[in-house]
Amino acid sequence: MIAKPLIGLVPLLLVACATTPPAGPTVKVTPLGTHAGELCNRDRAMIFEDPTGVRVLYDAGTSVLGGNDARLGAIHVVLLSHAHGDHMGDQRLTALEAGTCQSPTLATAAPNTTSAEIAASKNAGLVMINQMANFLGKRVEAIKGQPTPACPVGAAGDDHTVPFAASCLAGNNLGGTRTFKTANAAKGVEITIVPASHDSSVNRALLSEAERRNLEPDNLTLPLGPPSGYVVRFTNGLVMYLTGDTALHADMKNVVADFHKPNAMVLNLGQSAITNASGAWIADDVIRPATVIISHPNEAASVDGKPRPGSRTAEMSAMMHSRVVLALSGRTMEFDGQGRCLAGCS
């Protein structure tokens, strides 16, 4: 038998390579830190923009200027993982690049917080554990001079159309899901509150004088419900797990990995909650995402946009097998529906 030449196969291979389908619409993720192009000590804030235009702010914290920060743009939803001041925003950045990456120059944002200032300025919905939503709703009321209403809902009772006409409350409990869509979109962004293992007490400086007097004799703070993370399901298929501040816990496997199946995650560092070994294990053995975004470093984590040698961030990144990217301030990353970073990731 004489073998036939495979000449005709080459053009077919070339055609197959040339017609690989494009990645499709992407979710844009933009960190808002204290120093452009770096991941710094106090950096927390992150904006997620769905292909349909829904824009979500996660943990405004202290690396923003407040409600008038020009980097924000439109914000439809404000997320808050827990009540600590570095997430709620008991301080604000005095100016972009003020101070150093390790020690940025901050000023008080009490009693209103940066989260409330942004929600008030942007007419955003407060999407978080009920107690925190109610607390921030009163701060929004103080800013705007009128009570903060519940967010209008659609026929399903847990769906919302953005933009809202005014700041509003969309609090929920652990496990609760709300959907946010633009008027002409077929689908919306689904946001589910998931467990975290941490503390969620509010700084006394943010409380009323009467409440402070009640707590100070026993050196107590006020808990605002359980801490949380989020699973955000975008319309292009990206499923992003936002860990919040948390230690390793069993619900990461049962609730987050097995049920929600995220394909990307934002992992908060911080010595009080997570070790390098446990952080790497969460990424590589529990969640197993296509991409891990490192945030909340509690150190000057980068130099010229690269992990600072000898830092905890560099050490943990080196331990992970997943693709690791730093949440560099002002650098917009783009993610496809499989959790792959297609642009903006070093």
Placement of each model-derived feature along the sequence:
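A short, conserved beta-to-alpha structural element at the edge of catalytic cores
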Residues: 265-281
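Active-site-proximal beta-strand/loop segments in catalytic clefts of secreted hydrolases
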Residues: 32-35, 58-61, 81-84, 129-131, ...
